[in-house]
Regions:
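Sec-dependent N-terminal signal peptides
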Residues: 3-13, 17
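Surface-exposed amphipathic alpha-helical segments
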Residues: 18, 38, 140-172
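N-terminal "mature-domain start" segment
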Residues: 18-48
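Residue-level detection of beta-strand-connecting loop/turn positions
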Residues: 28-29, 113, 125, 139
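Stable alpha-helical elements in mature extracytoplasmic
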Residues: 34, 79-82, 86, 90, ...
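A mature extracytoplasmic/lumenal domain signature
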Residues: 36-38, 66, 120-121, 146-148
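Conserved polar/disulfide-associated segments of primarily extracytoplasmic proteins
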Residues: 46-134
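C-terminal charged interaction modules
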Residues: 131-143
Length: 172
């Protein structure tokens, strides 16, 4: 079930009443600003991830959720401890899965508030390579990912990091 949700991550939700653009309000709380226009596809009710598609045929997922609603949450965790718990929870799930996904850590930048990692799996005769950024902002866990087989790894990493650092902010 989680594999399906991971790959699809779609459902109806409020996204600023627009379907295309570079700014979207998610969860009525966070403004996500993309470097270029993207198309909002849908939102997944279970994961809270919003799915977008850009002109380079990238599938981009963004989720910002209250950490206290997560099963790994413990009262009193620092931002760094929260990030490590979130990353470990998601990473370990995929590492121990039954679908033969290959899970790798790309870079761990705890001082900058994020971890980059990847999941590679075969799905319906296609090799899927998803790069993920796990982060924490204002005690909320942030999940951003991209799937685009034509994009270079450095471009994917830059997009995720820039989106995390500059593109996601609390909406007043």
């Amino acid at each position: 079930m989680r594999v399906f949700l991971f790959l699809m991550l779609f459902f109806n939700s409020f996204v600023w009443a627009q379907q295309e653009g570079n700014k979207f309000l998610i969860n009525n709380d966070y403004l996500v600003q993309f470097p270029e226009s993207v198309k909002y596809i849908r939102t997944d009710e279970n994961s809270g991830a919003f799915l977008f598609h850009d002109k380079q045929n990238s599938n981009i997922q963004v989720s910002v959720r209250p950490s206290q609603n997560m099963e790994f949450y413990k009262e009193g965790l620092s931002q760094t401890e929260l990030l490590e718990a979130f990353y470990k929870w998601d990473f370990d799930f995929w590492k121990s899965n039954t679908i033969n996904a290959k899970v790798t850590e790309i870079s761990k930048k705890l001082s900058e508030g994020y971890v980059l990692w990847g999941i590679e799996l075969d799905y319906e005769s296609q090799k899927i390579n998803q790069i993920i950024l796990s982060g924490v902002k204002e005690n909320n866990v942030v999940f951003i990912s991209i799937i685009n087989p034509k994009m270079k790894m450095n471009e994917k990493k830059k997009l995720l990091i820039d989106l995390y650092k500059k593109g996601i902010s609390k909406h007043n």
